[in-house]
Amino acid sequence: MMITLRKLPLAVAVAAGVMSAQAMAVDFHGYARSGIGWTGSGGEQQCFQVTGAQSKYRLGNECETYAELKLGQEVWKEGDKSFYFDTNVAYSVNQQNDWESTDPAFREANVQGKNLIEWLPGSTIWAGKRFYQRHDVHMIDFYYWDISGPGAGIENIDLGFGKLSLAATRSTEAGGSYTFSSQNIYDEVKDTANDVFDVRLAGLQTNPDGVLELGVDYGRANTTDGYKLVDGASKDGWMFTAEHTQSMLKGYNKFVVQYATDAMTTQGKGQARGSDGSSSFTEELPDGTKINYANKVINNNGDMWRILDHGAISLGDKWGLMYVGMYQNIDWDNNLGTEWWTVGVRPMYKWTPIMSTLLEVGYDNVKSQQTGDRNNQYKITLAQQWQAGDSIWSRPAIRIFATYAKWDEKWGYIKDGDNISRYAAATNSGISTNSRGDSDEWTFGAQMEIWW
């Protein structure tokens, strides 16, 4: 008994050491931003995004607290074979109070198995909810190739001349399909699952320090037996992507060309939309004239072109630069599309290895296909920043900023009660829209941003 008791502390110590080693193996990654801001005309910080654009220039122009908390662990390894479990929970609040409750978004929960298929060395099979090979422009927080969601696939199959990846994911629309419920009337509504099938070929050597990635995405509405889509709904579509990445000046330049059809045009990033329905509504003009806007599904029949160039480079020891230029044209058969182009730069001057000054200048211009009118906005931000390193990507960062924006909006989306419809009208038409008119504003504040 004495021997057993004497061995007990050693056993406890060994067990504690094993559990500690296991606990230390957990990977903790994430992203967060938060701050406080004011508006020159009074009140809390306003943020500026031109009506019709899908994103905005983000420096000194983010009005929410947002966080992604990722926990993952390699749960099994034998030789070069392994299983990795990954999760991600995201939060977003308006940063107005100390206590702001919100429902978290469970954005990732997946398992990735590496080198499990003997005859496909280096490949990874996976299943679950996942951020899947996302492509974005950081300075405008714009994701131009992103099929994230619940799914499964195999990636990084070595073909010798490039890496092949295959995946299937899903995104669901509310109220998109209908079935007979009573008296032979389609009045029972069910959400519609939109499936996306993705094929990518990456790592194609094109020139010194240059690689090409090609991709094809097919998305379609997958209705349940006994249900049907609303007449005229966009049922499917394609998206084709070619992206050339050039390593240069201690950074990179990416040139992207994308073409999409029908259901793949709304979001323009690889997820299908078009099975959802919308109700008719009536708009009354100041003179009493009433205009009826008929029931119209999210009919996305048409096409989208996007040409994009963006990058981040170093210009000597003291300067860094982010930049973006993009043209996007969504041409729909129902005449509700838009033409959007944007250009912006964010130079960084490094006073010390941990202190810098940033200047972001961005311009957006959006034309309504329905009205022919244009909205435009200039946005300028000057920020003084302290960051963990001398790269334009160094984080965490704490910055103080001042932002000025001037806009002139000639059109807006027509209001349907508390909602915004997909119909557009000129600002001077007398119809109630979400157009901001012709004005300007400035804001100032402080913000932290971190990824790890």
Curated annotation (Swiss-Prot):
Site note Important in sugar transport, residues: 143
Entries under Pfam families matching the protein: LamB
Catalysed reactions listed for this entry: beta-maltose(in) = beta-maltose(out)
A GO molecular-function annotation: maltodextrin transmembrane transporter activity
Keyword vocabulary terms for this entry: Cell outer membrane, Ion transport, Membrane, Porin, Signal, Sugar transport, Transmembrane, Transmembrane beta strand, Transport
GO cellular component: cell outer membrane; pore complex
Tree of life domain: Bacteria
Induction data: By maltose.
Record's bilayer topology term: Multi-pass membrane protein
Assembly, per entry: Homotrimer formed of three 18-stranded antiparallel beta-barrels, containing three independent channels.
Function according to Swiss-Prot or TrEMBL: Involved in the transport of maltose and maltodextrins.
Entry's family note: Belongs to the porin LamB (TC 1.B.3) family.
Protein name: Maltoporin
Gene: lamB
